[in-house]
């Protein structure tokens, strides 16, 4: 990975720093993302998606350390952590107890947070350059299929947000979602 970002990459980073929503490719579909610490940006994302805040959101990161400020992982056993780390980096999202200080705009009505360490090269690079995880939800309007190309993002959202152009990974389905405490499967991947 280069230590310098391209101009297109820089424009997406600038948008993140300005508390804007961006679109970017992930393992299966394009995602909408923003700075998880910006209530303004998260609210903008929720409005774009027509998604109620109570549902909570997913954080996507380059590495587990980026997620730790939001998580109360001391509630997990070594065995539970081992199961989680065996799936990362990769397309499995784990629901983990959140720190009490984790913003409600991320956790929604829950005391947990859904998190994933991505293996998509552009996601990894984006989180590395930005220095923290991103909120990640599929790029699609309510009732429409998730976007798989930058052009589909433009068709659904117009010019409302900057797009990091690139290919999605080879997966057909969105990430699997599992509960780290119970192992329960919430969504098949």
Swiss-Prot record:
Predominant location = cytoplasm
State the compartments where it is located: Cytoplasm
Extract one GO cellular component term from the record. cytoplasm
Any one Gene Ontology biological process term? regulation of translational fidelity
Domain named YrdC-like is located at: 6-189
Disulfide bond annotation, renumbered to this chain: none
Q: Name one Pfam family in it.
A: Sua5_yciO_yrdC
Keywords for the protein's UniProt record, in alphabetical order: ATP-binding, Cytoplasm, Nucleotide-binding, Nucleotidyltransferase, Transferase, tRNA processing
Q: Which PANTHER family match?
A: SUA5, THREONYLCARBAMOYL-AMP SYNTHASE
Q: What is this protein called?
A: Threonylcarbamoyl-AMP synthase
Originating species: Photorhabdus laumondii subsp. laumondii (strain DSM 15139 / CIP 105565 / TT01)
**Gene it is expressed from:** tsaC
